[in-house]
Amino acid sequence: TVITANQDILPRISSISHLGWYEKHFIPYDEEISIDTKEEAPKLIQSIHDKGTLAEWVKFIEPLFKSSIYLRLVVAACLASVLIEKCSALPFVLHLWGGSGAGKTVALKVAASVWGNPENYTQTINMTPNALMQIAGILHSLPLLGDELQTIKSNIAGQNYDKLIMQLTEG
C-alpha cells in the first residue's frame, strides 16, 4: 500500500480518543498528541479553543458572579473537573434545579466558556444513553455540561435514571 511504501517519509502523529489527561499531557492543549475522534463529535471538539484573554473573561463574568450562585457553582465544578483524576478523587454530578428564568442555562454557558465556545460545548441532553456515554467518553477529564435534563428522563423509558448517572460517573 501507499502507506507501507512511504513509512520512512510519512510523519508519525500520536493520537488519543479522548480529551483531558493522558499521562502528563492535557489534550487538546498538547502539541505532541492529537485527538482522533473529531468525526464523532466535530462541533464539540472544534468548540474547545481559546479566544481572548483571561483578563477579558474575568471582566465579563465578574458582575455575573456577584448575582448568581448557580454561576459560581457551575464554574467551580467546571474547573474542578480536570483536577479529579490528578487528585485520585471520585467523579461528581452537579444538577441545578430551579424554575425557568433562574439562570441555569446562562450559568452553563458561562462555565462552558472556560473551555471554549459555549454554544457548541454545552450539550442538549436530549439524546440516547449510548450517545451520551460516547460524548462523556470523549470529554474524559473535561466536564459534560448538559442542558434541559428533563428531556432525558422521557428518552430513557424503562431505564433507571440513577443507573444512567452511575454509568456516566463510573465510566
Predicted feature residues:
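Structured core elements
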Residues: 27, 95, 143-145
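AAA+/P-loop NTPase substrate/partner-engagement loops
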Residues: 105-160
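Conserved catalytic/switch belt of AAA+ P-loop NTPases
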Residues: 161-171
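A structural signal for alpha-helix termini and helix-coil/disorder junctions
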Residues: 2-5, 67, 85, 171
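P-loop NTPase catalytic core of nucleic-acid-dependent motor ATPases
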Residues: 33-120
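Conserved glycine-centered beta->alpha loop in an early N-terminal alpha/beta scaffold
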Residues: 1-65, 134, 139, 156
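Residue-identity detector for threonine
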Residues: 1-4, 37, 53, 105, ...
